């Protein structure tokens, strides 16, 4: 953020009105390359999009000169007959403009966030809500709830709605026209909002920062209604959050909301007065849970569908919102199947000469690894078949033995690390068995031997590659409880870094 303020020395009262000229400034592309997703050093030699090019100041200057010409944005046209421009592939210039544009479009939000916290101090890190708050919620609050609304974030009916929403933050008409150009040029919004696993290479390599910003802004707009309802119905101080991209440190929360729809909601807010309504979200999926009745959740579902379609022009089909009763059905979230099951216990109460036997059922959080989708993913990656029988990896037989064992062991440890929050560890043992035997069959295939003789020759050292050092980690973090590490290995353990393993969250 300090870099951005150092480069952009302009009056803050005019920042949002003059964004378009920044597209012609060289330092914008230096910034984009500096703190972009690659995290590389500016002007350092690198390969972009698998082309043999160098990101240098000379290429940036050529790009700016080209944009000053009459038809400067024709370089973004993906014409297969003209693959080279000034000796470089045009996809390189397309990526550079997209990255620079993503930096510029973040400026109004970033500077407003900084200015809102000038002279203020954030006293407690707990106020910086994040995805990490999901795990305490599951442990402390989830077991006391009855129903859950499983919601897929709605998406705009038309791309023009994104531009209209940004007009409230950016008044530069030329910049908004350029935004329309990018939206219609790449046609990536549908693949992003529908959360498809197979996204095109253009989004993955060129426009990731730009379209993630648009998606975050879209989610921020769709979630603003919850802030409004919270303020109007409970009169409590509430804040909304907006996440900027590829930041490794927490930012504060933006205390900004446009008060709208006052007359529309005044007569129906009494329907939703539930002090135990909880909401959390990750990626394109959100959860609303409550201790209320099924009728209340049906009202919320009907209300949200009509609200998003009528007031926000979001396409939200009713089948994108499912009502689940936690006692009867598991919830698919963060790659886990989470549910609530009663844990019966018997208590003997002695009162003078009388004794009473009391049956108590305490709800307990049950997190299960989705074994069938997980085995399907492993079968797709050629570690096993659809029945869960391990198979060899012929494509890896050309690598040294140490590399093969390291690759298998690293994948196995990542999966075990991610699903350490499972309440049933037997599924993890089966996954470890698949990786262990698949590695053994791969090595046996390479050395033209049988699996039995190969395992006999390697001995117990082969198994150590696939055993996660969970006890060692716990003894390092909590040295006083190393004696009970065997008991802790059977308990549910949440690691905050599992949110970086995105592939395991989309197994369905």
UniProtKB/Swiss-Prot annotation:
Protein name: Maturase K
Keywords: Chloroplast, mRNA processing, Plastid, RNA-binding, tRNA processing
HAMAP family with a match to the protein in the record: MatK
One GO biological process term: tRNA processing
GO cellular component, one term: chloroplast
Function in brief: Usually encoded in the trnK tRNA gene intron. Probably assists in splicing its own and other chloroplast group II introns.
An annotated Gene Ontology molecular function: RNA binding
A Pfam family annotated for this UniProt entry: Intron_maturas2
Family indicated by similarity: Belongs to the intron maturase 2 family. MatK subfamily.
Subcellular location: Plastid, Chloroplast
Key word Cell wall biogenesis/degradation present: no
Key word Chloroplast present: yes
